[in-house]
Amino acid sequence: MNKKKNTILIGLYFLVGIMLFPDRIYAMHIAEGFLPVKWAGIWWIAMLPFLALGIKKVKSITQKEGPGIKMLLALAGAFVFVLSSLKLPSLTGSCSHPTGVGLGAILFGPWPMVVLGCIVLIFQAVLLAHGGLTTLGANVFSMAIVGPFVAYGAYRLLKKLNAPNWLSVFTGSALGNLLTYITTATQLAWAFPGKTGFIASLIKFMGVFATTQVPLAVTEGLVTVLIFNLLLEYSEGELKELSVISKGETV
């Protein structure tokens, strides 16, 4: 990657930050101490194997790939941090936020995003008081495991069906966002089924964010397509090296 491409990619960090970073930072993660100990432990145990495999994948990228690919990996992590730190108010009085995991999943596959998402969530829990360490397993499972795997799966499926690149990127990113919140609602419903049972509790928790999450997922999909277009223009070689696109493809 030449100096011009490095400059453009570094500029993207600041561009995304200027456009999206709010004055105050909030995140819709399950808060510290909110889950019962049993469920907090279950999600930690469920998350750890994914994290271990993700670390191996990231280690392989950092050891074998060139500076251009490493820059894209860093960009994917920054994209997750910025978007997942963005608060949007909900009509229910709570808040929602994008996840940003779709871009990295499309570029590198879902495994590295488990690690990047975990790092972001730890940073937010320790330094920004968003989420928590006891609930880290649950938050990682929803945002850094389910989200990236859904985004990557949807993207690859549409590519196999010869869908346009823009549609594949948009759909993968949007579905990754939506399934993250569905997973979070499911986690809360399992932990707090209430007197009416799991299904009623799930509907209640999903309803908390439904009014904002669908348009938010659409917005995240559009932003991801925009960033992907910029990467295609200035980092086409790296995208081909990652087998994200083939020669002659456009978004």
From Swiss-Prot:
Part of the energy-coupling factor (ECF) transporter complex CbiMNOQ involved in cobalt import. It comes from the Bacteria. GO terms for cellular component: ATP-binding cassette (ABC) transporter complex. Belongs to the CbiM family. The keyword Cell membrane applies. The chain crosses the membrane at residues 35-55, 66-86, 103-123, 131-151, 166-186, 208-228. Its main location: membrane. HAMAP family: CbiM. Keywords: Cell membrane, Cobalamin biosynthesis, Cobalt, Cobalt transport, Ion transport, Membrane, Signal, Transmembrane, Transmembrane helix, Transport. The keyword Lipid metabolism does not apply. This is Cobalt transport protein CbiM. Residues 1-27 form the signal peptide. Pfam families: CbiM. It is a multi-pass membrane protein. One of its GO terms (biological process) is cobalamin biosynthetic process. Forms an energy-coupling factor (ECF) transporter complex composed of an ATP-binding protein (A component, CbiO), a transmembrane protein (T component, CbiQ) and 2 possible substrate-capture proteins (S components, CbiM and CbiN) of unknown stoichimetry. One of its GO terms (molecular function) is cobalt ion transmembrane transporter activity. InterPro entries: CbiM (IPR018024), CbiM/NikMN (IPR002751).
